[in-house]
């Protein structure tokens, strides 16, 4: 199973905002046994977003998660781009509109805003691609969307980290299933990653594992993450590498 992630926002490209969403989504997908093959960041432009969505769909991922650009402002255009990419029209989601209305009325009652009126900017967030299943935003206003398209499960989530994390946990992860999978972290006692590389390559050829290495500066250790379908396979891979003269400490 493989997945791709698209994050949307000019602020991500200018460096004004750290793209923590992509790291969080990738970690959650990896924990579910998905191989995240690509993370793409794109600005707030309809055609640019449409283009990267189509590029991703051409690679036929099992899951595509898009985050950002669902708010009420002029540059929140992700739903428009998704609809264009899929050849669908945007339609009003009445349930979403009611939830948005209730959200702003609650903020008004709490004294956080001075006007709960559903103006055009707020109504805009209730439009989803035709046929999409709305995803409830339990901590914010903008709903997300779930669309199955030619074998790919597409999820469109808000860009605000708190909203994205809640929707990911409550609406996305229950829909994507998981694959049995184990990951273990080790510190390899070797100072030169180039000397470790051929041993890792040989290990991957022999055992059904994926291995990521992460040098810890020019110190004594190199961080290793090993992924496999069961812990026994990881143990065998580690023992093999130990037989090549590499010592390991579990954990980082």
Curated annotation (Swiss-Prot):
**CDD domains named among the record's database cross-references:** cinA (cd00885)
By its UniProt entry, which InterPro entries does this protein fall under? Answer: CinA, CinA_Arc, MoaB/Mog-like_dom_sf, MoaB/Mog_dom
Output the superkingdom of the source species.
Archaea
Pfam families to which the protein is assigned, alphabetical: MoCF_biosynth
Q: Which Gene3D superfamilies match?
A: MoaB/Mog-like domain (3.40.980.10)
HAMAP family according to UniProt? CinA_A
Return the similarity comment.
Belongs to the CinA family.
Instruction: Return the protein name.
Output: Protein PF0476
Organism per entry: Pyrococcus furiosus (strain ATCC 43587 / DSM 3638 / JCM 8422 / Vc1)
Q: What is the lineage of its organism?
A: Archaea, Methanobacteriati, Methanobacteriota, Thermococci, Thermococcales
């Amino acid at each position: 199973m493989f997945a791709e992630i698209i994050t949307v926002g000019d602020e991500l490209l200018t460096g004004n905002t750290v793209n923590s969403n992509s790291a969080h989504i990738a970690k959650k997908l990896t924990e579910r046994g998905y191989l995240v093959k690509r993370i793409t960041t794109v600005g707030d432009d309809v055609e640019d977003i449409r283009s990267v969505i189509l590029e991703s769909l051409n690679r036929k991922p099992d899951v595509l998660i898009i985050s950002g650009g669902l708010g009420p402002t002029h540059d929140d255009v992700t739903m428009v781009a998704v609809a264009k990419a899929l050849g669908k029209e945007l339609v009003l989601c009445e349930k979403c509109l009611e939830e948005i209305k209730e959200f702003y009325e609650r903020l008004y009652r709490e004294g956080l805003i001075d006007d709960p009126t559903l103006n055009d900017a707020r109504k805009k967030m209730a439009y989803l691609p035709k046929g999409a299943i709305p995803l409830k935003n339990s901590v914010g206003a903008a709903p997300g969307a779930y669309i199955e398209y030619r074998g790919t499960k597409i999820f469109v989530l808000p860009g605000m980290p708190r909203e994205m994390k809640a929707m990911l946990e409550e609406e996305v992860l229950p829909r994507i299933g998981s694959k049995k999978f184990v990951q273990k972290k080790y510190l390899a006692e070797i100072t030169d990653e180039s000397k470790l590389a051929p041993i890792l390559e040989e290990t991957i050829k022999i055992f059904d594992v994926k291995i990521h290495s992460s040098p810890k500066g020019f110190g004594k250790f190199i961080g290793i993450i090993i992924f496999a379908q069961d812990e026994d396979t990881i143990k065998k891979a580690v023992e093999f590498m130990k037989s090549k003269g590499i010592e390991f400490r579990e954990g980082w």
